[in-house]
Amino acid sequence: MGYGGWNRGERKQDAVDAFLRGGFDLFGRQHEMMFGGSFSRQRNHYDNSMPDAVYGMVDVGNFKNWNGNIADPQWTPWKLYSKDDIRQSSAYSSARFSLADPLHLILGARYTQYNIRYNPAGSPNTRLESTKDDVTPYAGLVYDINEDWSTYVSYTSIFQPQDKRDVSGRYLDPTTGKSYEAGVKADWFNTRLTTSLAIFRIEQDNVASNTYTYMPSGESIYESLDGVVSKGVEFELNGALTDNWQLTFGATRYIAEDKNGNAVSSDQPRTTMKLFTRYQLPMLPELTVGGGVNWQNKVWTDVEGGPAGRSRAEQGSYGLVNLFSRYQVTKNFAVQANVNNLFDKEYYDYVGSYVVYGAPLNVSVSASYDF
């Protein structure tokens, strides 16, 4: 069986953010403070049309022998897929206190109010409204070991509205939780070369988890998970190795599990690495060449309800190599060529109840002009 559909819609978004920042003296030391506020509004309206069959399913025969051709089915009339009016306003403040020459304390808080008026998926005659608000404090302590090295610890509260729906077509409650982080940072040669190493732990409730089942409208059904814990480590190195040669390297490793020890979001890689470099030719300074590789480990999804019952879709670890060259024709005008997926690696960019192939080898050329 195959699944298809037409979608159309529009999104309009407006946002404003304003803040004041300044310094002040207290107890003979210089400190900093900031106050601000923001408001955003987003309006979405989407319709869809499907083949006139159950959930848009069309018989394509044996998919192993299918060549991609199929007769144009009878399409259903356009109907409402989703219609939302989302407003979010916030007020925030932060301060950086100099406790001693090497020691700084950072304190802050944000108040957020989130309001959404929407139609449950596939229910054009039902209008719902939900308003949530929360205060999210954060704090950090930074200690300068010497001119090059510093260490820090931080705490942040989490309040994150979601755009996923449950089986009734209602939006899930915002994700809430706490985040803890500690690390070291260093910079050398007047910040020409920087590096950082951090460990983190994130505790969350109301985390959206895809059930890989669908509403009659075709929209995915999600459920909320409580007691989700993510913990891991990050490393990054950025800088200029010479006047003409720049390098970036980063690596992340983490695990995420629910309160029962089950993997959460297993369709996202647990280990990632990136290496990117660029070089400006000394004999032809207008030309810059570079490239890099992005690598990730295996991802998978367990799906219920298939012809064979429970099944697993997975993508093994892989790396993608990309190249670029940029020529500065004039001070304002430049031309750039990009080669993505240099070795034409075949891979799945998404794994779930279906899979989506990643982009094959492709080349693009662009021009830019700075005024």
Task: Place the predicted regions along the sequence by residue.
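Face-selective signature of the C-terminal outer-membrane beta-barrel domain
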Residues: 2-119
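Conserved C-terminal beta-signal and adjacent last beta-strands/turns
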Residues: 9, 33, 180, 266-371
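Hydrophobic, lipid-facing positions within transmembrane beta-strands of outer-membrane proteins
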Residues: 12-18, 87-93, 135-141, 168, ...
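Residue-level signature of outer-membrane beta-barrel architecture
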Residues: 22-25, 97-98, 133, 141-144, ...
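Transmembrane beta-strands of outer-membrane beta-barrel pores
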Residues: 37-43, 111-115, 155-161, 188, ...
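Gram-negative outer-membrane beta-barrel transporters
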Residues: 101, 201, 223-304, 343-346
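Membrane-embedded beta-barrel scaffold of Gram-negative outer-membrane proteins
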Residues: 144, 151-152, 175-240, 247-252
